[in-house]
UniProtKB/Swiss-Prot annotation:
Pfam families: Iron_traffic. GO terms for cellular component: cytosol. This is Probable Fe(2+)-trafficking protein. GO terms for molecular function: iron ion binding. The keyword Isomerase does not apply. GO terms for biological process: cellular response to oxidative stress. InterPro entries: Fe_traffick_prot_YggX (IPR007457), Fe_traffick_prot_YggX_sf (IPR036766). Keywords: Iron. Belongs to the Fe(2+)-trafficking protein family. PANTHER family: FE(2+)-TRAFFICKING PROTEIN-RELATED.
């Protein structure tokens, strides 16, 4: 049976992550409080940020920036600002 968590991002009970995907205390907080669905949303935003801002994951400053964006998106209900991106019209 799948593990469930109360997802802080989505504010509902949902399927939790299968294992801790991020190291340290932040990773533990993500594992215990973020659903697979919310993590997938973050991965999409993360990819866009890396591409649009030309982030280098070998650069500690870029990793720190991305971590701040991740915490804001997952736990502080902040939207990720991606310059020049316009969502498709429905």
């Amino acid at each position: 049976m799948a593990r469930t968590v109360f997802c802080q991002k989505l504010q509902k009970e949902a399927e939790g992550l299968g294992f801790q995907l991020y190291p340290g205390e932040i990773g533990e907080k993500i594992f215990n409080n973020i659903s697979k669905e919310a993590w997938a949303q973050w991965q999409h935003k993360q990819t866009m940020l890396i591409n649009e801002k030309h982030l280098n994951m070998m650069d500690p400053e870029h990793r720190s920036f991305l971590e701040q964006q991740m915490v804001g998106f997952l736990f502080e209900n902040k939207e990720v600002e991606i310059e020049g991106y316009k969502p498709p019209e429905k």
